Structure formats: C-alpha cells, structure tokens
Amino acid sequence: CGGGGGNSGTGSAAGGTGRGPITFVTGKDNSNVWAPTVAKWNAAHADQKVTVKEQSDQADQQHDDIVQHMQAKDAGYDIVTVDVVWTAEFAAKNWLVPLKGDFALDTSKLLKPPVVAATYHGTLYAAPFASDGGMLYYRKDLVPNPPKTLDEMWSMCSIAKQHNMNCYAGQFQKYEGLTVNAAEAINTQGGQIVDGSGKVTVDSPEARKGLQMLADHYKNGDIPQEAITYQEEQGRAAFESGKLLFLRNWPYVYNLATTDGSSVVKDKFAVAPLPGVTGPGASSLGGHSEGISVYSKYKATALDFLKFIEEDAQQKFFMEQGSLAPVVGSIYADATLVAKYPYLPTLLTSIQNAVPRPVTPFYPAVTKAIEDNSYAAIKGDKSVDQAIKDMSAAISAASGG
C-alpha cells in the first residue's frame, strides 16, 4: 500500500496524495451504519485507520460545521459527508478533490441520478453512497389499488372522510422538507425552479399549477390543518396511529411502521411511486455522497475508503442496517433483499424519476426563498401568483451572490 509522501505536489489542493490515518465526518449515526463499516475497514488497514467524527443530526448544523472547517483549511476533515444539495456550493468553493484523473471513480454500476447529484459542471466531486426518493405510503386495507395519478389520489379523499381520517400529508413545515415537497409538486406538473444552466425558471404556468394544487387541497381540508406543522417524524406518527390515508415520506418509514410497537398499521399499509399527472410523479432526489477535502494529507487512503463504501457488500449492509437506498443498481433486483424489503422496486422507480433540487452554489438562500413563499401560499397568506413572483425574485437575488 505504498503512495507518495504527504507533502507531494504543490499547494494544499494538489498535495497530500499519500496514505495514512484519516477522519471521516458525518451526521449523527442514528442507524449505526458507520461504526461497523469503519471497524471492518480498520481491521484490514492497520496503518490507514479511519476515525469517525459525528456531527449533529441537523442538516443545517452539519453544513455550517463543514463550511467552518473548510474555511479554516483544516486538514483534520479528510472525508466529509455531502448532502446532495451541497455539492455545487462545495465544488464551486474548491473544497472537494475532483474525482477524475488519478482520483477517478468507476460509476458505471451506479444509478444515474445520484451520480448527477454529485457532479458539478460536468465533473464528479463526491462518491454517492446512499440515494433517497419519496414514496407514497397508503392504507392497502382501505385503498386496494394505489392511485397512479394525482387526480386519482385526491378523488380517494372521500374514502378518508368515510373513515373519519385525514387524507394526505407530506412535509409542509417551513424547513428543507417543504422545499422538497414544493419542488415535487412543481416538477411533477412539468415546471422547473432553476434550469440546468442556473437560470431561474420558476415563474411559469406549470410551477403555479403545482403550488396551487397544494394550496387548494390545504384549503379544502384534503391536507389537514395540522400538516402545516409536519416534518418527517410528525407525518410518520400520524400515519402509524391510523390518522392518515396517504403519506409522502422517505423509505426509512417503512421498517419503522412495520416494527414500531405503537404502529396500528403494521399489516395494513403498502407503498407506491408518488403519483404524477399521467404516471409516476417526480420525487425530489435525496441522499448523500462522500467528498475528499482538498486539505487532507492522505487523499489516497480517502479515495480507497470511498471505493470501499461503494462495494456491493457495503451497499447491502447500508440497506439492511440503516434502510439507506443503495446507489448500486443491481441491488434492487436482489431477490433475497426484495423478499425482505418489498418496497425496493417502488423506491427504484422513485429514484429513476427523481429530479434534483436546484443545483446552485447559493443553495441555502435559494431554499429559504422556496420555503418561505411556498409556506405563505399553502397557508393562504399570499396568493400563489404573488408567492411564485416573490420566489423567483428572491432566488434571482440569492443567485446573484
């Protein structure tokens, strides 16, 4: 396991291509996937041990922690966990080693959407290790055939009324989850918040239609009043307690709704792709990748660790231990796993139809513009027309730097 010395190259970005102990920075390891993964690596790499540094479980705090350490050119953060929406910002600031040339990664066996999400201006900057896509959880005892279109789903709200339940919820509190849900509504109608070149394109009839749908169904009660306070966990609790017919949420809910002692829907629910206009809707793409800091002294070790977490065995472990969506496509066809996790084919459909949230180096300000205006429109504090105009103006202002 040779390699250049830690001082090879010129300047911090090119230097540190050798091997040695590294620190891996990630959000709070709630599902206990990293301790065993790192233990397995360390058992085989005595002189290149990986130490895990856990951050908080709040995405904005994780983001700010990485920013702080990168601005300080801290060599102690060798590998950082990058939420799909941070790629552009970290790449534009030259904080991540481009994964090309000597640092190239083979992405041929990976699903395309997570690779695209880890790419900025045509260059891969991080190694995808877990993807994520939204799914529609539904009560199969009350809805034998899941809705394929939005119109079908909303028409089924009469079933909820018959059973004194609420119909539909997603994540509508004013936080990142609302950007996810608003973007799904807009993209599913054929709208786009920001185009591929970074131009703001949200001021369109399609975007208005998407946001209007959420506002209308909140107003008429199909989306219950309390759903404006829901993040992921509040929606899960409502669904598990039998109060909701439909819930838009991430795959992690599946195992919990099946095993939680308090869940009254254990054998009564199933999942389907998010409904769209004529077929599957456009989920917002979730997930994380791992980037190598340009300030790391041991980039060769970091690259090997990135390759290790993309191996099939590790990807299966992440799936089974943490309900993390694999980035290796073939795993979704693994008969043993599908028998154990029946939602895998639905999740694959979701990821394949997923749309990244706006790709921009100014993401924190852009998502705030989306959240604030979507929230105001759904609550009825602003007309949808005004909310879209204000959103467009605020995103343009943020993108101007």
Language model regions located:
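Long, aromatic- and glycine/proline-rich binding clefts that accommodate carbohydrate-like moieties
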Residues: 117-118, 269-272, 320-369
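Glycine-centered hinge/linker elements that transmit conformational signals in sensory
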Residues: 156-157, 199-228
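Conserved C-terminal helix/tail region of periplasmic/extracytoplasmic solute-binding proteins
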Residues: 349-401
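Conserved N-terminal structural module of periplasmic/extracytoplasmic solute-binding proteins
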Residues: 1-88, 263, 276-278, 300-301, ...
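Hinge/lid segment of periplasmic solute-binding proteins
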Residues: 84-133, 145, 152-154, 164, ...
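Short, solvent-exposed loop/beta-turn-alpha elements that line the ligand-binding surface or hinge
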Residues: 100-110, 172, 191-209, 259-264, ...
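Extracytoplasmic/periplasmic substrate-recognition and gating elements
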Residues: 43, 212, 219-222, 258-323, ...
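Short helix-initiation/N-cap motifs at beta->coil->alpha
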Residues: 55-66, 85, 151-152, 226-240
